[in-house]
């Protein structure tokens, strides 16, 4: 049984903790919170031991939250630590808590790539991460792009170049201090956005350029992709590649999928926790092939898409399961769409 500690119990961390708790080969030994807020109380109510920094223990006690120990205590009790701290805090934690303890550590895409030995996406480079001490799961947008490109590559469809245009959600649903509210903001104005170079930390030989804007929504990101293939292909070939690849969902307008909000509503109706949609949501009707040119649009649920990747990264770090066994095990445990998917 792999003992997993989760440092940071916010948007991503709480989802990772819940996902780890569903694995039959892992258990959550504790989570780190720095503020004694409602999320800390929920963590305790879910049965996760709560840890914090040594100088914050008294604040938690005053708030009526039992503290199991310090950050150092949790790291010592863990086989693998998943750091889901806010951007750049993971690097600080590495220097402050992690370097001196010989464990395995998983960081998130908000950290720069050099925080880890390898940037990770399960479909693309699971084996490259096996046995690594420091692994970085790439960001939500990078995960979405990498999955789409990997679906093609894994099915023998080569890529000459990819040009991806991203409409980023302005904030997560709970982020009341972020925006925009009534604007469309180049994010950044310069080309490329950071997503293309980030994809290349995983798929190192892909010719990719990305551009992004932030828009006043909270539900999901939308990607509009132009991909030049290695030669003429049929639309059916591309659709079959997406249909067979895990963690990709093909949505039909005829079935009622006409917007990103409908994916979230679908997830709620399915009874998925928090209305999460970890799959890349590809609009089947948008998939267009003209000779060697592929066009498509797809949605990326920023709050949950990286969660299955983190579970697989834990196994990769310890080298306990082969790639496809881990991916299938994770997908089934999280009740992702597995019918018709190829795990080999």
From Swiss-Prot:
Question: What pathway is this protein said to act in by its record?
Answer: Carbohydrate degradation; glycolysis; pyruvate from D-glyceraldehyde 3-phosphate: step 1/5
One Gene Ontology molecular-function label: 4-hydroxy-tetrahydrodipicolinate reductase
Which positions are catalytic residues? 140
EC identifiers of the protein:
1.2.1.59
Q: Quick one: which residues bind D-glyceraldehyde 3-phosphate?
A: 139-141, 195-196
Which residues fall in a coiled-coil region?
A: none
Q: Which keywords belong to this entry?
A: Cytoplasm, Glycolysis, NAD, NADP, Oxidoreductase
Q: Please name the Pfam families in this protein's record.
A: DapB_N, Gp_dh_C
Tell me which Gene Ontology terms the entry assigns under biological process: glycolytic process; lysine biosynthetic process via diaminopimelate
Name the InterPro entries for this protein.
Answer: DapB_N (IPR000846), GlycerAld/Erythrose_P_DH (IPR020831), GlycerAld_3-P_DH_AS (IPR020830), GlycerAld_3-P_DH_cat (IPR020829), GlycerAld_3-P_DH_NAD(P)-bd (IPR020828), Glyceraldehyde-3-P_DH_2_arc (IPR006436), NAD(P)-bd_dom_sf (IPR036291)
| Gene3D superfamilies documented for this protein | Dihydrodipicolinate Reductase, domain 2, NAD(P)-binding Rossmann-like Domain
Annotated residues for binding of NAD(+)? 11-12, 110, 169, 302
Outline the subunit composition. Answer: Homotetramer.
- What this protein is called in its record is Glyceraldehyde-3-phosphate dehydrogenase
Q: Which organism is it from?
A: Pyrobaculum calidifontis (strain DSM 21063 / JCM 11548 / VA1)
């Amino acid at each position: 049984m792999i003992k997993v500690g989760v440092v940071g119990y916010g948007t991503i961390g709480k989802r990772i903790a819940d996902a780890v708790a569903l694995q039959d080969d892992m258990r959550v030994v504790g989570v780190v919170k720095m503020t004694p807020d409602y999320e800390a109380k929920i963590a305790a109510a879910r049965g996760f031991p709560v840890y914090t920094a040594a100088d914050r223990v008294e604040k938690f006690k005053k708030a009526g939250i039992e503290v199991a120990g310090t950050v150092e205590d949790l790291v010592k009790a863990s086989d693998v630590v998943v750091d889901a701290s806010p951007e750049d805090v993971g690097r600080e934690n590495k220097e402050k808590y992690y370097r001196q303890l010989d464990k395995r550590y998983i960081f998130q895409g908000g950290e720069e790539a050099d925080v880890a030995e390898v940037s990770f996406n399960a479909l693309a480079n699971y084996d490259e991460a096996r046995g690594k001490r420091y692994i970085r799961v790439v960001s939500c947008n990078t995960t979405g792009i990498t999955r789409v490109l990997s679906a093609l590559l894994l099915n023998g469809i080569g890529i000459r170049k990819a040009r991806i245009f991203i409409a980023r959600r302005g904030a997560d649903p709970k982020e009341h201090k972020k925006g925009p509210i009534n604007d469309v903001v180049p994010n950044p104005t310069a080309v490329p956005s950071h997503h293309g170079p980030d994809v290349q930390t995983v798929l190192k030989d892909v010719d990719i350029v990305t551009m992004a804007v932030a828009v006043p929504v909270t539900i999901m990101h939308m990607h509009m992709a132009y991909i030049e293939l290695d030669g003429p292909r049929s639309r059916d070939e591309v659709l079959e590649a997406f249909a067979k690849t895990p963690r990709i969902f093909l949505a039909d307008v005829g079935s009622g999928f006409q917007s990103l909000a409908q994916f979230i509503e679908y997830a709620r109706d399915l009874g998925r926790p928090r209305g999460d949609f970890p799959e890349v949501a590809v609009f089947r009707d948008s998939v267009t092939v003209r000779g060697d040119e592929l066009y498509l649009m797809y949605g990326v649920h920023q709050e949950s898409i990286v969660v299955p990747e983190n579970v697989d990264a834990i196994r990769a770090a310890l080298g306990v399961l082969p790639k496809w066994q881990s991916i299938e095990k994770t997908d089934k445990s999280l009740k992702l769409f597995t019918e018709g998917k190829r795990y080999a």
